């Protein structure tokens, strides 16, 4: 049986349609501030990438956005009826209980056999349908997780390190698939990623997060910014052309904002 690919969704041509707003978000764990003064708007059909140092609050920010974590202060506003697809940073599979890809996808509530077949086709993994989840490569697993995330055709895809465990060629293919997915579903995508050399060619806006939003901008504005070099390192900046934005501050080694000249 030949499976037709997903039919593109025409929700609206408005690119200014707001899906999610975060207003004055703060998150504190045991008196330690994880996020402060976060203001963020996610628009329909946009791709936003969150970058920053380990421990800077990127995954915490996604959890707040998903309403999986209640902020200590601030508001999280979702468009009424917003459908969200989520790919977590890690998936823990019990190797004593093998499960096929098709069965794994079917565990998602209210999904149909045709929708599973269409998702497998979209991500070019039809041949993996009867394979064990536990035996998939990193790239194959990420494609399966993405296929599962779009089964109910979400308006927003939230991805936490979607390229983790995927080789360079696989990362390029996956980013192409994400761009294709945005076109088919007319959805927004927000992701956390460390793969900056590929990210910058495949995103509309970048947020640098280190407890707060240090800076935000489009990829093409950043390549020569001295603060970008300070944040990510001189050698990295020399090898890759990126977006330009402006910090009005620096961080010390503990992630705190420096007052005056920063010696870090």
From Swiss-Prot:
It is found in: Cell inner membrane. One of its GO terms (molecular function) is ATP hydrolysis activity. Its EC number is 7.2.2.20. Belongs to the ABC transporter superfamily. Zinc importer (TC 3.A.1.15.5) family. The gene is znuC. This is Zinc import ATP-binding protein ZnuC. It holds the Pfam family ABC_tran. Residues 20-235 form the ABC transporter domain. The complex is composed of two ATP-binding proteins (ZnuC), two transmembrane proteins (ZnuB) and a solute-binding protein (ZnuA). It catalyses: Zn(2+)(out) + ATP(in) + H2O(in) = Zn(2+)(in) + ADP(in) + phosphate(in) + H(+)(in). The keyword Transport applies. Part of the ABC transporter complex ZnuABC involved in zinc import. Responsible for energy coupling to the transport system.
